[in-house]
């Protein structure tokens, strides 16, 4: 969606924006920027270059790669092969990490490396400066400046960024950006307006969750993307004081191991504390000092369960083809906020439900900025135009609905294929905020049945237009909701499949135990047995009544 905003005063330059892909749903990030006479491509993470090839890409003047993640760089090698004359600019670390996206090919360095914090004139009148953006080693915030006579036009593209310091990369520094006042700011809205705990608090909670599971004698499986989060988790487990010297085996899947090897080659570009650690012991591979860390191949015969094991892998179906394939008790850790679709490749939720020796836990290790830090960055930069990309439509909508942004900036959130003109004027007219989405409905109360102690039910009917909202799929995933009072308002919350699975696991009982959890009439924590005095009531999983009927007998 793009908010049409009138701008009074003289239009100084032709700046326009055309996204070919604004997120994983489009096959990756690929953005085209027209700045003065120049046509500039910001990232190319497209799996299929067809939309780009249809737009005469041979006339592109420059390509910038913000960082090496697959959804920002996957299409660059194919693009370079077809148009080798077009320069692709990136940081040195990004150039080294990019080949990980094509593990089956020999990919020589094909990017032109730009230094940090040093403006470079790359075309007549056009300068570019790269600033470390956090999120991933080598990730860059790109500052473009075009000089046209007496006027300077400034565009900033954040790529993926994070203000917080991570284990292996320092966060984006705000001080050099303060008061830049770009004409256009293009930034990600990955986490929408969510407010997350501080990164160190997230790490503390993650370590506590790992500790709790290991104390139960269980092994841990972490399906993660191969670059970034995987190495963050391994470094955290290797260096945290609660794990130093502890007899735990860490295993890295094949693609994760390739990422670890690549990090070994960029140690000089990592934070000081990481370099100091690497001077005294290996950053990753170590079978001498606990916790041990070894690469894991497809041959499961190498997996030793003599000590508790933590397996971190992307290609986990090859490692764990079925729930019965591994001995011992296992807990699967899943991220609360998914950073890449590859976190969930072929994840078999139903298999976990069928095998009680497998449990599910979730964790939060955010590598993007939350809503609080997003607005902080915006207010420090003070742009005229604000273009949101790279996020779920509902999360982007949450950001563009903020009054503090609507009253100060011209907001845009275009879908793939929708061009946006960004006129630069000398005066700003506050845009009319979009109307809020309100869904009207009705409430019907069903009469109670005193004979069976049924308290009655309430049915809420809402307009069918609510189904068109992108949030509905997640809200209605299981068909189960929870309601609570918030002042005079009733708040409804959908129960996700993952949350329901955790509830089922926590309520499991031995099959020979006569309780509600093992009764054929136990549905969604309610009794549905017409001859039971508890019919229609919410019941505990360990409850019991005289008319119990076993699931096994049915």
Swiss-Prot record:
Superkingdom classification of source: Bacteria
InterPro entries for the chain: MBL (IPR050698), Metallo-B-lactamas (IPR001279), RibonucZ/Hydroxyglut_hydro (IPR036866)
Pfam families, per database record: Lactamase_B_2
GO molecular function, one term: RNA endonuclease activity
PANTHER family: CLEAVAGE AND POLYADENYLATION SPECIFICITY FACTOR FAMILY MEMBER, INTEGRATOR COMPLEX SUBUNIT 11
Protein family: To M.jannaschii MJ0047, MJ0162 and MJ1236.
Name listed for the protein in its UniProt record: Uncharacterized protein sll0514
